[in-house]
Amino acid sequence: MSQSYINVIGAGLAGSEAAYQIAERGIPVKLYEMRGVKSTPQHKTDNFAELVCSNSLRGDALTNAVGLLKEEMRRLGSVILESAEATRVPAGGALAVDRDGFSQMVTEKVVNHPLIEVVRDEITELPTDVITVVATGPLTSDALAEKIHALNNGDGFYFYDAAAPIIDVNTIDMSKVYLKSRYDKGEAAYLNAPMTKQEFMDFHEALVNAEEAPLNSFEKEKYFEGCMPIEVMAKRGIKTMLYGPMKPVGLEYPDDYTGPRDGEFKTPYAVVQLRQDNAAGSLYNIVGFQTHLKWGEQKRVFQMIPGLENAEFVRYGVMHRNSYMDSPNLLEQTYRSKKQPNLFFAGQMTGVEGYVESAASGLVAGINAARLFKEESEAIFPETTAIGSLAHYITHADSKHFQPMNVNFGIIKELEGERIRDKKARYEKIAERALADLEEFLTV
């Protein structure tokens, strides 16, 4: 394939990472981004790698699969991880970032790379004669989505996910909340709004009866479990939220707490957590409260949370439709298209779910696009690594039941020999093997 550059379509997490990886290998990149010419309802700025749903990149420990994935990406020179580390905000054991600072830094690193040319334009056709990484994300424009849909055998794979509301910290009644991380892990990074049993029951009743924004009548409500609207979770059962975002375990009342409680219990019946959303600490998001309620209903119901009675919402929760591909039938383990070999796909459209996973897919797609350009052999990462297991899973899953997947230890190749019963010790061993295998893979 004779060409002098590689196309990357989309400058989200996956596209920005792919473009950067290609350019770092000495190959010119044309990076196309339609924002600036055509906006989407969910994005607030024209910056790259904008975080729409949450500002958290989740756990950082190696005993957490996404923590392992992040460490692998660091070792592979990820621009997304480098920018995240530079803009992180307190979040206990998680890696959370200043949302605007993070996307601004990614934008600057990509735009200022001497081998990356940014083109602000909407692409409506899939190129046939140039190596191209398609990373247009869940909010792909209708025109291009139609072309991808045709590659996808006409099957419409989709699910809905949602973003949580963001609140002005100065409007939170601090006398009713307390600062603490679950199990006191890391620094006290979350504001916790405790509820008594009666407060929770009243809140649940209001939530399940609140009015939702309508979906298109011809579409079914299919949600990804990791980003499920809080009202959908509440309707599954009165205690479902108590095992999810309102779980009180490890969030005991502080000694100086004087607010309402159930008898002498040391732990609240339920807890709503708020996490810092920007470096200045002026904004907080309600953790796990992705929602599709009408905005007026969000204000009414969420102001029932102790401490939020007069809260000002700087952004209400929103929901959007995510389309994804039949990757088991359409993609190689390198994220290369089986039907149109000049194309690579990356990001949530491939069926990886989560910010870190999207960036990881862009990293692998970018590396392999560069290798194809240089006529080098493809790079298939070991299934013993987090980054390799994710690529293997989405390309080898049962197509009939394929759904988006977060990275987890269940998809990483099992350890050989006798099973280690202690979960933490087992995960430590898997992580140790993964990093050793990655280092060996990179030296071959």
UniProtKB/Swiss-Prot annotation:
Spell out the Gene3D superfamilies in the cross-references.
Answer: FAD/NAD(P)-binding domain
**Major site of localization recorded for this protein:** cytoplasm
Task: Name the UniProt key words of this record, in alphabetical order.
Answer: Cytoplasm, FAD, Flavoprotein, Methyltransferase, NAD, NADP, Transferase, tRNA processing
Question: Please, which domain of life does this record's source organism belong to?
Answer: Bacteria
Entry's Pfam families?
GIDA
State any GO BP term from the record. Answer: tRNA wobble uridine modification
Which InterPro entries does this UniProt record tie to the protein?
A: FAD/NAD-bd_sf (IPR036188), MnmG-rel (IPR002218), MnmG-rel_CS (IPR020595), MnmG_N (IPR040131), TrmFO (IPR004417)
Q: Write out the similarity annotation.
A: Belongs to the MnmG family. TrmFO subfamily.
Q: What name does the UniProt record give this protein?
A: Methylenetetrahydrofolate--tRNA-(uracil-5-)-methyltransferase TrmFO
Name the gene. trmFO
